[in-house]
Amino acid sequence: MLHRAMEILERGHQALIARYQALGLLQVNNDGEYHSSGGVSYSDELPAAGYDGTPRLCDLWASAESQELAQVSPRMHAAFALAYERRLLEPFGLTGYGCCEDLTLKLQDVLTLPHLRRVSVAPTADVARCAEQIGRRCILSWKPQPAQLVGQWDEGMLRGYLHSARQAA
């Protein structure tokens, strides 16, 4: 039953994208616009070859995330999110994945998404493990824990926190 619901949602998104195309509503989005969750869309790879001034999906960035499935196993995440998101992302030129969900244990599958250029690493994620898995395959877009900035100010602690994440990445 859940797969049926996901199929309906996927078809709905595909129809929406097709409608945007038909109405000429697509715009090239590679000029530093905010992209998804915590990224910008700088790229000299888009628009793709053959661009004639009318944006196609292959000329655009797209993104997906699965915060709602943050607590499910990697196997369930692959079956109930990535399987559908993969098909939605396929026609786009570059893609990003993630928001505030910890993808540490799910990156093996996430990194197989088409045209993946950026992965969001949540505050709760193991930055070192994520960096090891991501390597130089795409951009690691880390979101620091905002709670580190509230309460008693400790510049040394904050510098150490940021330095350790930077070293890991």
Give the location of each predicted region.
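Active-site loop segments of alpha/beta catalytic cores
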Residues: 1-169
